[in-house]
C-alpha cells in the first residue's frame, strides 16, 4: 500500500514514523539530505487538556506520553529528520520545559538541534498561533509547523516539494477521520470532523470549518463559486496539524492578535483572503506580501501577490492523525504496535505459565507472573503484573502495579497507578498514581484522585 497518491514507500518501513532503523544518517532505504535554509521547523508541545487524566500537574507533559513505548515527541521529530531538517524550534509551556529538556539530553535518539522555547505568556488557554506569535522573532524563512501529537506516515519531502512547485501562501495536511478498531463509550463522544472544501484540479483549499461550528446549514459566496465552480466538500476529514507557510504569514500573525489558533482562526482567515477582495483590502494584506522581509527564496523576487491556500489529503488507511484525545491516543498506540514486530518484549521477566500475545509490546523491567494472559496490549517500563491477571486491548504506562486476579479490558492506565486485586475494569481511564481499591468493578469510568483534582483547580 502506498503512503499517499504520489509515493510508494511501504508503511512498515517508513522511517518517518518509526525513527532510526540503522545508525548514522541513513534511515532504512532513505539517505537523508539537509533541508536548505529556505525552511524552518516549529513543533508545538501544548498542555493536552483532551488527554486528561493522562496529563495533569503530577503527570508527564503531553509531549512525553508514550505511544508504542516511545515518547510522543519522538515521532514528529523523526518525521522532520526524515525530511532532512537539522534543527527545529520546540514551543512548550514553562512547567514542561525541564521534563522535555531532560528527555532531549538523555532519551532523544535523533541528530537534530532542538531549540526549546517556553514563553511565559503561554498557558492552557493559548493556542498554536499564539505560540507562533511568541517566537516570531526566531522565524526568518518559510516554515513548517506540526504538533507533538502528529503521527504521520507521509514522506515529508513530498509536502515540501509540493509547496515549492505550487508556491502557495500555505499548505495544510488533512486525512480521513481515524477509524477506531474498537468503539468505546469515550470514542463515541469524539467528533473531530471538519467541513473541507477543495478544488480537486488545483488542490486549492476553499472552505475550512469545524462541523460543530457550521450546524445544519452553511453558505458559499457566489464570488467563490464563480471563480471555482467545481468544489468538493469533504465531511470525513480532520487536520493532521501539519502546515507549511510563507514567511509573510508570521508577520500577519504577529500583528493580528485576534488570530489565536492555526486551525480555527488562521486557516479560515487565509481561505477568506483568496476570494474576498474587499476583505483583503480592508485588512491591508498587501503590505505583508510586499514587505522587504518577504523576499521569495526561489527567484529572488517578492512573494507571490496571489494568496493561495492548498490542501494535501492523505489516502485512507495511512497513519496520518493526531493523538490529541484519548480515543485517538488509544488507537494510534495500537497502530504503531502493529508496525514494530521486532522488540516486542524488551528485557522483561515473563513466567513460563503466562501468555503474552504476539500482538503485544512490553517494555524493560516489567514482570508478568503465573497464569496471566496479555493480549493486544502495550505495557510500559517497570510494571508488575500479578498472578491470574487478564489484560486485553489496553495501554499500561510505566511503574504500574496490577495485583492478582485483575481483569482489564480496553483501559488506559497512567503511570504509577495501582490496580487492587480482583478488580474488573472495562473501558476505564485510570489517572496518574491512582489507587483502585480491591474488587472494584467499573465500566466507562474515569478513575482519578479527587484530592489532586482540587489541587490542580487551586
Curated annotation (Swiss-Prot):
Cellular component aspect of the GO annotation: cytosol; eukaryotic translation initiation factor 2B complex; guanyl-nucleotide exchange factor complex
Stored SUPFAM superfamilies: Nucleotide-diphospho-sugar transferases (SSF53448)
Compartments it resides in: Cytoplasm, Cytosol
Gene Ontology MF terms in the entry: guanyl-nucleotide exchange factor activity; translation initiation factor activity
Classification via Pfam families: LbH_EIF2B, NTP_transferase
One GO term (biological process): cytoplasmic translational initiation
UniProt KW tRNA-binding keyword: no
Signal peptide: none
Residues annotated with Phosphoserine modification: 291
Keyword entries, A-Z: Cytoplasm, Initiation factor, Phosphoprotein, Protein biosynthesis
The keyword Lipid biosynthesis is annotated on this UniProt entry: no
Top-level taxon in the UniProt lineage: Eukaryota
InterPro entries: eIF2B_gamma (IPR051960), NTP_transferase_dom (IPR005835), Nucleotide-diphossugar_trans (IPR029044)
Primary residence: cytoplasm
Subunit structure: Component of the translation initiation factor 2B (eIF2B) complex which is a heterodecamer of two sets of five different subunits: alpha, beta, gamma, delta and epsilon. Subunits alpha, beta and delta comprise a regulatory subcomplex and subunits epsilon and gamma comprise a catalytic subcomplex. Within the complex, the hexameric regulatory complex resides at the center, with the two heterodimeric catalytic subcomplexes bound on opposite sides.
Similarity field: Belongs to the eIF-2B gamma/epsilon subunits family.
Role of this protein: Acts as a component of the translation initiation factor 2B (eIF2B) complex, which catalyzes the exchange of GDP for GTP on the eukaryotic initiation factor 2 (eIF2) complex gamma subunit. Its guanine nucleotide exchange factor activity is repressed when bound to eIF2 complex phosphorylated on the alpha subunit, thereby limiting the amount of methionyl-initiator methionine tRNA available to the ribosome and consequently global translation is repressed.
Protein name (record): Translation initiation factor eIF2B subunit gamma
Species whose genome carries this gene: Schizosaccharomyces pombe (strain 972 / ATCC 24843) (Fission yeast)
Protein's gene: tif223
Amino acid at each position: 500500500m502506498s503512503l499517499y497518491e504520489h509515493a510508494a514507500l511501504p508503511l512498515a518501513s517508513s522511517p518517518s514514523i518509526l525513527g532510526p532503523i540503522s545508525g548514522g544518517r541513513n534511515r532504512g532505504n532513505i539517505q537523508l539530505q539537509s533541508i536548505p535554509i529556505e525552511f524552518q521547523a516549529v513543533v508545538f508541545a501544548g498542555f493536552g487538556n483532551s488527554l486528561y487524566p493522562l496529563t495533569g500537574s503530577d503527570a508527564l507533559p503531553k509531549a512525553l506520553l508514550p505511544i508504542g513505548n516511545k515518547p510522543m515527541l519522538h515521532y514528529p521529530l523523526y518525521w522532520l529528520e526524515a525530511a532532512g531538517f537539522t534543527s527545529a524550534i520546540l514551543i512548550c509551556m514553562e512547567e514542561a520545559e525541564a521534563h522535555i529538556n531532560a528527555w532531549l539530553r538523555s532519551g532523544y535518539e535523533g541528530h537534530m538541534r532542538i531549540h526549546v522555547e517556553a514563553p511565559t505568556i503561554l498557558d492552557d488557554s493559548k493556542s498554536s498561533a499564539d505560540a507562533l506569535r511568541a517566537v516570531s522573532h526566531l522565524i526568518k524563512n518559510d516554515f513548517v509547523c506540526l504538533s507533538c501529537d502528529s503521527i504521520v506516515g507521509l514522506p515529508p519531502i513530498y509536502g515540501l516539494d509540493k509547496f515549492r512547485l505550487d508556491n502557495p501562501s500555505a499548505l495544510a495536511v488533512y486525512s480521513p477521520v481515524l477509524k477506531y478498531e474498537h468503539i468505546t463509550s469515550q470514542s463515541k463522544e469524539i467528533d473531530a470532523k471538519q467541513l473541507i472544501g477543495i478544488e480537486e484540479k488545483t488542490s486549492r483549499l476553499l472552505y475550512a470549518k469545524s462541523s460543530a461550528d457550521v450546524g445544519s446549514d452553511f453558505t458559499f459566496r457566489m464570488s467563490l463559486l464563480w471563480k471555482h465552480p467545481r468544489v468538493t466538500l469533504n465531511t470525513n476529514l480532520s487536520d493532521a496539524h501539519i502546515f507549511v507557510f510563507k514567511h509573510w504569514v508570521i508577520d500577519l500573525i504577529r500583528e493580528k492578535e485576534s488570530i489565536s489558533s492555526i486551525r480555527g482562526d488562521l486557516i479560515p482567515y487565509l481561505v477568506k483572503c483568496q476570494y474576498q477582495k474587499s476583505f483583503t483590502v480592508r485588512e491591508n494584506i498587501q503590505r505583508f506580501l510586499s514587505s522587504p522581509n518577504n523576499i521569495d527564496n526561489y527567484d529572488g523576487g517578492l512573494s507571490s501577490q496571489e494568496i493561495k491556500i492548498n490542501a494535501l489529503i492523505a489516502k485512507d488507511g495511512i497513519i496520518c492523525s493526531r493523538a490529541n484525545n484519548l480515543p485517538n491516543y488509544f488507537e494510534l498506540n495500537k497502530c504503531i504496535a502493529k508496525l514494530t514486530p521486532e522488540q516486542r518484549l524488551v528485557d522483561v521477566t515473563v513466567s513460563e505459565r503466562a501468555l503474552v500475545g504476539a500482538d503485544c509490546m512490553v517494555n524493560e523491567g516489567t514482570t508478568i507472573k503465573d497464569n496471566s494472559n496479555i493480549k493486544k496490549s502495550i505495557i510500559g517500563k517497570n510494571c508488575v503484573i500479578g498472578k491470574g491477571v487478564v489484560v486485553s486491548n489496553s495501554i499500561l504506562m510505566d511503574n504500574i502495579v496490577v495485583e492478582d486476579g485483575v481483569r482489564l479490558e480496553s483501559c488506559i492506565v497512567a503511570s504509577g497507578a495501582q490496580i487492587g486485586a480482583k478488580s474488573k475494569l472495562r473501558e476505564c481511564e485510570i489517572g496518574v498514581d491512582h489507587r483502585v481499591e480491591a474488587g472494584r468493578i467499573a465500566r466507562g469510568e474515569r478513575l482519578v484522585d479527587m484530592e489532586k483534582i482540587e489541587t490542580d483547580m487551586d
